[in-house]
């Protein structure tokens, strides 16, 4: 416990230089245009009617808040000229965006400055490279096949937002900013049901996602920090086996001495008591713990995590959110794919002199499938098809030009193929392309009050080229013009693209 506290204090000490500017004493616009934020996201605020407000409006609002009489009136007389008026939706939405975006800009400054200072270093530490999403793809392709057990974790959200605010106290030395954050969260949301009642969440709207994303990332960063500590200390924790309390360090020392005289027994037994190498991968709100070794070690880690969230973050996590499965018999949802590692038999013919015989071996293969139900559900929600996948027209787009309609449908199709290009089976994607292509044809036919067959014949190859995906172009370049090439024949090929996070939200259904 003392080591845990010391490790935590060391972690806090690193962030003591993160002194946040006082929101009520400094002009935000001076920080918003700081050189450390030049490479980050734009600080412009987009309102509910698509009007853009610069950070200068944040400055004006803060100056207005400096006026003590106005602030007192807005609190003491909530129905008279108050700062956040629920009776006037525009002003409520407008001020909420300014305050949330302004606070997010302020708290992001130290992290941006830290990234800028790290970029000037000659060498980037290896563990920082492994934190990139790009490291997930080689892990799934190369190392995942050699593991045995999989723990699929749905990272829980804190039930009470006060937990998120308290986590910032470890890194924040600006108390007024914390009080302001509490005021903002309490004023704009139902404090006790912000996370549980998704439809009434005000902060999770698109206009306020920057602030909530910062709070969520702070929570995940704190959780992963302590998880790393538990992983480093796991080899030193005591182990209970057959009613005997064994100290791991001394036991392994004795086993090494015993293994000198009985090497065969040592190799078969020592793995049972030592923690194997564990791999941790996270994307958005889902994480994976995968490793080799005994099943009881995975159950031990499940118990660790349940107790960890209970005592470190003061809320109970349902054990069902941590699923423990054998990798060979499980299918898990990750990165928008349904992934599995099936074992398929492979017959190998061997020839020895005049005799030949067959040997059956089992090989593992990492299999990724684009989820048909969720993809069709997203298309149905966007009114491209029915719930059963039957294509329908898009009436709202009939006012656009023909080329705009073709471009929109083609771009959605290409983005879906681009995001799910890592799928080992493309049948679902071909079905999605068929839905979008026929929906586009019906939209054009509805616009011109004609039939689908007429427009298919009029546009011809131009209509098909709009749905010719980037992945098909890549594979077509691998073959010469004289070689017969059918993209359907290469349905098992996989290409991982690194820019999938910047694609439209439609390509990440229910994730």
UniProtKB/Swiss-Prot annotation:
A GO molecular-function descriptor: RNA binding
Gene Ontology BP term (one): mRNA processing
Keyword Chaperone: no
Compartments, record wording: Plastid, Chloroplast
Family: Belongs to the intron maturase 2 family. MatK subfamily.
Function as written in the Swiss-Prot or TrEMBL entry: Usually encoded in the trnK tRNA gene intron. Probably assists in splicing its own and other chloroplast group II introns.
Gene Ontology CC terms: chloroplast
Gene name for this UniProt entry: matK
Record's keyword annotation contains tRNA processing: yes
Signal peptide: none
UniProt-listed PANTHER family: MATURASE K
Keywords, comma-separated and alphabetical: Chloroplast, mRNA processing, Plastid, RNA-binding, tRNA processing
Taxonomy, superkingdom: Eukaryota
Protein name: Maturase K
